[in-house]
Curated annotation (Swiss-Prot):
Top-level lineage group: Bacteria
Protein name: ATP-dependent Clp protease proteolytic subunit
Keywords on record: Cytoplasm, Hydrolase, Protease, Serine protease
Its job: Cleaves peptides in various proteins in a process that requires ATP hydrolysis. Has a chymotrypsin-like activity. Plays a major role in the degradation of misfolded proteins.
Source organism: Ralstonia nicotianae (strain ATCC BAA-1114 / GMI1000) (Ralstonia solanacearum)
Entry keyword annotation includes Hydrolase: yes
Amino acid sequence: MIRNELIDQLARTQASALETQGLGLVPMVVEQSGRGERAYDIYSRLLKERVIFMVGEVNDQTANLVVAQLLFLESENPDKDISLYINSPGGSVSAGLAMYDTMQFVKPDVSTLCMGMAASMGAFLLAAGAKGKRYALPNSRIMIHQPLGGARGQASDIEIQAREILYLRERLNTILSEVTGQPVDKIARDTDRDNFMSGDQAKEYGLIDKVLARRGA
């Protein structure tokens, strides 16, 4: 009972966040059991199957939800894979790195799947899934580029912020090199501007392992 309540609470929070992002109302599903009927919002039901959605902009709110769900599912079963479904244009680097670090921190393998778009930090998180378990659907688009940023204020403050952006660019390039097998200098060249790829191109590049047309294919 407590487990179901925790799942419901986590998923309701995610469902509320998705609604605030303008993604519409969250549908409900009803399950029959020997104890009667039980209604779940769709994300609660999928969370029971160890499926997490990372949809929309990467920000602190979505990062906190994904991190919480990863930690919860690890506590439920540290040996069973977690699936992370991604449809995101990217967003905050710090929020993305929080999710990346947690994906590496938890014991279960985190399988990633791109549906629609995985751009910027969305593509970074897609590539950060467990090796051999990173997927994209046939018409998905994946885009990598260098981190974006702006600065204002005194010259010394602008210099500090510029150094931080350069550090983040180097760190992200290093991680992408590790997960794709591409040399760091090639990653740096390829992310200098927006670099869009199809699923097959992303597979060839090393961002994903397989393009899935059908489940179990």
